[in-house]
């Protein structure tokens, strides 16, 4: 697929131009709205997911913003979880609030609370299928049933599990948002986000295609679309290795916790807890298998003694990169409390269950023995 860096497009006739600009014919007229390279990526994702429409944006946050802008307006509210990505929380509670849109953050595991929170002014139900970094799994079918009973869409951020490995549509999701910066890009070479629309609410296509793309101006660049089209070609193979590495790593780290306790190692040099939804003793494991199959993603967390221990651990890593991205080909580590949730108060972090003892690991394609050894040496180096 060639990369069309063209900003504008020449037409054969005045009528052709008028038809394109007025939406009577879907054809590229200006690359803020349509671009052949970006459309190729959109069409590929559409074929992979069975979606009615796919829209590619310049980042994951742009995709989230545009999906919510379809439904959010003054006097409306968005019902969502206490557990959300930090920038999504800020978008809802800081940016949208200024325009008269209320956010109601509740425990989505309490289905009665979800029903009670939705009223005649609710625009949508929004969630992450697996929360970051809490690793809480949403019951998509149950929440979709509630949303549809109330006549509102279920919008789900599905970035944590690729759409090639589970069907959000079959679980009742109306609109998926995906940070294509993550698994799809793979090598952290491009930013992007996708809105995947399953057609249950026709207003999505109408507003994004003919309003938001024109007026907001956050369409994906052709270069990013080209890079991510290449990433899609290897997504399945990469994800299988990353998910298997994550499961193997989680199991070995659990064994390390037990061995360290049996050997009475110094408390500061211990992994206190391992959280991964692929582990059979994880409280969300059964639901995760039901929804996502046998693969459980490439994100896990470990808990250490305190923040000082976490910083020491990160500083002593030799193979794993200190970076904020997720689902890169390379393994990454971050301290969420002080970084992606850094701007929030201690009280807000407590409400979101973000602890200063937690390290988030994104497991890459390296040899799993090397990843494990790097974690162990960094833990044992904690003073």
Question: Model regions: which residues?
Answer:
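Short, well-ordered beta-strand elements within core beta-sheets of diverse protein domains
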Residues: 227-237, 297-305, 360-364
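Conserved small-domain helix->loop->beta segment predominantly found in fold-type I
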Residues: 247-330, 344-352
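Glycine-rich beta-alpha junction loops
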Residues: 7-12, 182, 234, 278-282, ...
């Amino acid at each position: 697929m060639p990369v069309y860096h063209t900003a504008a497009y020449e037409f054969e006739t005045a009528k052709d131009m008028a038809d394109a600009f007025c939406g009577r014919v879907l054809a590229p007229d200006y690359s803020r709205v349509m671009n052949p390279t970006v459309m190729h990526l959109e069409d590929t994702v559409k074929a992979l997911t069975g979606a009615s429409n796919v829209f590619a944006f310049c980042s994951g946050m742009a995709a989230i913003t545009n999906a919510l802008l379809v439904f959010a307006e003054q006097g409306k509210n968005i019902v969502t979880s206490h557990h959300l990505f930090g920038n999504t929380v800020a978008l809802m509670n800081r940016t949208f609030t200024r325009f008269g849109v209320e956010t109601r953050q509740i425990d989505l595991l309490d289905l009665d609370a979800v029903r009670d929170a939705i009223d005649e002014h609710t625009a949508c139900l929004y969630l992450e299928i697996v929360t970051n970094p809490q690793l809480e799994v949403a019951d998509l079918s149950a929440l979709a049933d509630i949303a549809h009973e109330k006549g509102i869409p279920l919008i789900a951020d599905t970035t944590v599990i690729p759409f090639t490995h589970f069907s959000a549509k079959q679980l009742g999701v109306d609109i998926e948002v995906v940070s294509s910066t993550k698994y799809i890009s793979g090598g952290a070479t491009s930013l992007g986000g996708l809105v995947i629309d399953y057609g249950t609410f026709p207003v999505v296509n109408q507003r994004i295609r003919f309003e938001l793309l024109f007026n907001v101006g956050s369409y994906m660049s052709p270069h990013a679309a080209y890079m991510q089209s290449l990433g899609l070609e290897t997504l399945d193979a990469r994800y299988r290795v990353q998910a298997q590495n994550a499961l193997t790593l989680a199991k070995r780290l659990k064994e390390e916790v037990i061995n360290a306790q049996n050997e009475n190692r110094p408390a500061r040099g211990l992994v206190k807890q391992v959280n991964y939804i692929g582990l059979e003793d994880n409280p969300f494991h059964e639901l995760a298998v039901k929804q996502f199959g046998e693969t459980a993603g490439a994100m896990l967390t470990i808990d250490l003694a305190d923040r000082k221990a976490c910083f020491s651990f990160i500083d002593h890593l030799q193979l794993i990169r200190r970076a904020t991205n997720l689902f890169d080909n390379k393994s990454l580590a971050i301290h969420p409390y002080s970084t992606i949730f850094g701007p929030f108060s201690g009280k807000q972090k407590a409400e979101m269950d973000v602890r200063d003892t937690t390290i988030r690991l994104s497991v890459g394609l390296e040899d799993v023995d090397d990843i494990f050894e790097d974690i162990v040496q960094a833990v044992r180096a904690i003073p």
